[in-house]
A protein has these predicted regions:
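Positively charged, low-complexity intrinsically disordered leader regions
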Residues: 2-62, 66
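Rossmann-like adenosine-cofactor binding region
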Residues: 201-277
């Protein structure tokens, strides 16, 4: 049952900058123990996570639902069509009501302002499962994968090739907190959020270019995402034209460090943002990356909801 009482102390996770470097490192230590099956606690016993989906998903839904179950709790799937928020009920009302019923909320939606409003009025933890602005849970899992595969992010160059979308913005948030080198290659008019970029420049070594080769040169991690995200289907053809030359292929990967790894948050469109021989090749770590969503989010749930 939810905490119910107004004003009780709680912690939300809406963007990566909500956590300090030390907190992220502690989260990763816990996720590592969970992945190694060295963690046997059930901190979510008797607790329920409400999962609100305005955007459909495979990895977000399954990883959070399985994660809650493995921690002793349960997850309640709520599509926007199933609850009154989809019919115009004010978000503050939904936040207050859910706070009386459940112990945490994960929301995956379009408008980031909706997540902020939900968190402002909920008295239980709110987790951003994705918005059009940022995708913090995914990038946490990506950085955990970098640490797992390469030993850490210190001294590593991370490259992003493609749309300056919510994933690129979340990488900028991570660079703000962790201070690693980040190079983003995006076509003109598809650059990342300017506020995220300016914040990252203050603490990290960050560059935005229109030339993919500049971003990938010497990189230890090469990242990309689909060119047209969910809700942008009408723009797909125009985006394909705009992103010509931004495909991560074998020739582009040759410019990276010889031991570089390739990451993609999935779903992937082979032949568009990445070629099959890269995403299915020996440098790809996308399946480890996808698995790590489960472990990192379990650590997040245990931290926020226990």
């Amino acid at each position: 049952m939810g905490s119910g009482g107004e004003g009780l102390a709680k912690r939300d996770f809406l963007q990566i900058t909500d956590f300090s470097r030390k907190e992220i490192e502690q989260l990763f230590d816990l996720a590592k123990r969970m992945k190694a099956r060295q963690y046997r606690d059930t901190p979510l016993s008797g607790k329920t996570l409400a999962m609100i989906f305005a955007k459909s998903s495979t990895r977000t839904r399954v990883s959070f639902e399985v994660g809650a179950y493995q921690l002793g709790g349960q997850a309640l799937f709520l599509s926007s069509k199933d609850i009154q928020i989809g019919r115009g009920e004010p978000i503050p009302d939904t936040a207050r009501v859910l706070s009386r019923y459940v112990d945490g909320i994960m929301i995956r939606t379009y408008d980031h302002a909706e997540v902020e409003e939900l968190a402002r009025f909920a008295t239980i933890p709110v987790i951003n499962g994705l918005t059009d602005l940022t995708h913090p849970c995914q990038v946490l899992a990506d950085i955990f994968t970098v640490k797992e595969q390469l030993g850490g992010w210190e001294g590593k160059r991370i490259a992003w090739v493609g749309d300056g979308n919510n994933m690129a913005n979340a990488w900028l948030e991570a660079a703000t907190v962790l201070g690693f080198e980040l190079r983003l290659a995006c076509p003109e008019m598809f650059e990342p959020n300017i506020a995220k970029y300016e914040a990252a420049k203050k603490t990290g070594c960050v560059m935005v270019t229109e030339v993919p080769e500049e971003a990938v040169e010497g990189a230890h991690v090469v990242n990309t995402d689909v060119w047209a995200s969910m809700g942008q289907e009408a723009e797909a053809e125009a985006r394909r034209n705009a992103f010509k030359g931004f495909t991560v292929d074998r020739d582009l990967m040759k410019l990276a460090d010889p031991k570089a790894i390739f990451l993609h948050c999935l779903p992937a469109h082979r032949g568009e943002e990445v070629t099959a021989d890269v995403i299915d090749g020996p440098q790809s770590r996308v399946w480890d990356e996808a698995e790590n969503r489960l472990h990192v989010q379990k650590a997040l749930l245990a931290t926020l909801m226990s």
